[in-house]
């Protein structure tokens, strides 16, 4: 069984036959959520660090005797109550990455693309890739598809496409090998090239 993705070239409408094994799957919300959360978590640096009372210098000696000095009792200058003391609940380096195996990743991406096709947010247009780095040319092409956040999906990174789109708001470039699930989920529409769709079929099947 095969499905059809709307294909628009120079104002003429057509269809691109695709496999339902990739673009005809049910929407698994929990799996897609796990993919998006894992993707965002992996982007966190996790390098925030503070010094606790065990990390700051000094404090090996009791500042003054327990009684008779008139001061409040103290056992160390590293106490969080002191100006030069450590932080009570100090932040430490942390790896935020979450495990998501290849089988789950592919299933989640298939689910996203299937839902995009069902909602009419996925179209194919080979002419979307400009032949020269002209922002005005790309903006005019995108305008014909409507307004809103748009993801352009190419088979591989194209220099003309990257240069033409970098100054356009609400436009993101993805390739078949470097997909951003966050971009795909938030996109009003995804405009893909035929070669990118074929590469996805091979990669996700």
UniProtKB/Swiss-Prot annotation:
Q: Which InterPro entries match?
A: Ribosomal_uL4, Ribosomal_uL4-like, Ribosomal_uL4_dom_sf
**Molecular function terms, GO-annotated:** rRNA binding; structural constituent of ribosome
Task: Indicate yes or no for the key word Ribosomal protein.
Answer: yes
Q: Kindly state one GO CC term assigned in the UniProt record.
A: ribonucleoprotein complex
The reply on keyword RNA-binding is yes
Supply the alphabetized keyword list.
Answer: Ribonucleoprotein, Ribosomal protein, RNA-binding, rRNA-binding
> Its Gene Ontology biological processes?
translation
Q: Where is this region: Disordered?
A: 48-79
UniProt record similarity statement:
Belongs to the universal ribosomal protein uL4 family.
Q: What does this protein do?
A: One of the primary rRNA binding proteins, this protein initially binds near the 5'-end of the 23S rRNA. It is important during the early stages of 50S assembly. It makes multiple contacts with different domains of the 23S rRNA in the assembled 50S subunit and ribosome. Forms part of the polypeptide exit tunnel.
**Record text on subunit structure and interactions:** Part of the 50S ribosomal subunit.
Name of this chain's protein = Large ribosomal subunit protein uL4
Query: What phylogenetic lineage does the species belong to?
Result: Bacteria, Pseudomonadati, Pseudomonadota, Gammaproteobacteria, Methylococcales
Q: Which gene encodes it?
A: rplD
